[in-house]
Amino acid sequence: MPNALTKTIPAVRQKNLFLLPIISKVYNVMSPELGHYFLVLSIFVALTNKLRPVVVSLYFFLFTMSFFGILFCYISSDFSNYNVFTNSNANAPLFYKISGTWSNHEGSLLLWCWILSFYGFLFCYLARPCNVSKQAKGAENKNISFLFSSKGLDQRERAVSLIDEQQIYKGIALFFSIFLLASSNPFVRISFVCTKSLAELNPVLQDPILAIHPPCIYAGYVASAIGFCLCLSKIINRQQKSLKNIYIFFFPFLVKPKKGRRPEMAGPHTRTSPYSRVPFGSLAHREQAKSVVRKTNTMYFHFGWTCSANTVVWKQIQIWILTCWCFLTVGILLGSWWAYHELGWGGWWFWDPVENASFMPWVLATACIHSVILPKLNDWTLFLNMVTFLCCILGTFFVRSGLLASVHSFATDSTRGIFLWCFFLLITSISFLFFFKMKQQSSTKLVGALSVPSSNQDPTVSNPVNQILWHSRNTLIAHSYQFNRLAKLMEGTEGHDKVIVYKASRKPK
């Protein structure tokens, strides 16, 4: 009997080893198709009504499989893929094959979407309130009263009451998923069989610094998107809070005082509420969810530094804007170092349009760090966070539309530029509409921040003159180096520039 077992075990192992090359060959053939289908499924996942942790995990899994699919095509030199056929070389080292994945427009946009799904995964899992006490356990899902119900509002106000940061994130993720699949699909097959790539690998791109530089820039851009979702959600919910305060002023009997506690609203599931059986949604459930009693000094798991249990909105914004600033700083420094020792420009900075596209968000993120360092979420902080992400989208439009000439532009297709320009106009109009509507309802104005503080004012309150100067400098840079070229193109005094591809046979001494 033992001899029979010893004979069957090697046979099973040999059979499994025999199946491994077949499985590898099948995956090599099907990886572009699987990556394409994963991208299609990601759009349907982003279209779901509720962005729960399971849905975000599935969204992150789909983009991870898609990214590893194109990565496997580059490593195995699968020249049946058009993206690999035009951007890779079979004789390149393994490290540069991997970095060649994001050296083109399609691969870099797939990396952008993968980082966006990863940040959404962290944001959804780590920003959830944990260790909620039993007395306020259901405060996030229960109603406040029948008068605060969203069913009693009109259609426009009812739609606004359902908007939160996860819904805004879902809209951004949905756009980039559609944009990637419609105009920048990296899994396009070619109809003929080939064993050699179309283009040789550029010697300038064979640098370890350049392999790390683009992911750092993309990580900084996407981190600003999470801060944008938080700020826009805060602006929208501030209008709901003002409406709730009006109801409390006119209906004080709805306030249920408790001994030794803050007054709480008499919810529909409490004994004092006459509408305990009415299943209506709440208009102010998000504001009550922020006052949920939580245990202090608790974390969700090892990455609890991202959002602890007692973290407020301004702390989340501070963390994400610091993440954006750190990645942009590292990316700009690495790009300057690469330009200095590889391109031989004679300096660390050339004021290239692509360099300006990453420098403008860095300036705004620096101003936002000065504004968010104090535990006070004012209107100026919200405005700076929103403009930082809008500036990232604007810089991406300039780099990927082919409108401006640069040493390292990605694309010249006008269709991609139209997608990004429409998205930029849409989110800019929505953001400014809600922001200025909030400013009209607020008692303070942005211009009043320039006034000299009186002696009775709290000295810890920061004066945003420094932030305004940073923003003015950023606007000057944008006008001087970006929109000046656009004006010449519109006047017809300057023809459409072609993308400059720098090819060098050897490194400069």
From Swiss-Prot:
An annotated GO cellular component: membrane
This protein's record includes keyword Mitochondrion: yes
InterPro entries: Cyt_c_assembly, Cyt_c_biogenesis, Cyt_c_biogenesis_plant
rRNA-binding is among the record's keywords: no
One GO process term, biological-process aspect: cytochrome complex assembly
Keyword annotations: Cytochrome c-type biogenesis, Mitochondrion
Pfam families: Cytochrom_C_asm
Principal place of residence: mitochondrion
Any one GO molecular function term: heme transmembrane transporter activity
Domain of life: Eukaryota
Protein localization: Mitochondrion
Family: Belongs to the CcmF/CycK/Ccl1/NrfE/CcsA family.
Function: Could be involved in assembly and maturation of cytochromes c. May play a role in guidance of apocytochromes and heme groups for the covalent linkage introduced by the cytochrome-c-heme lyase.
Entry protein name: Probable cytochrome c biosynthesis protein
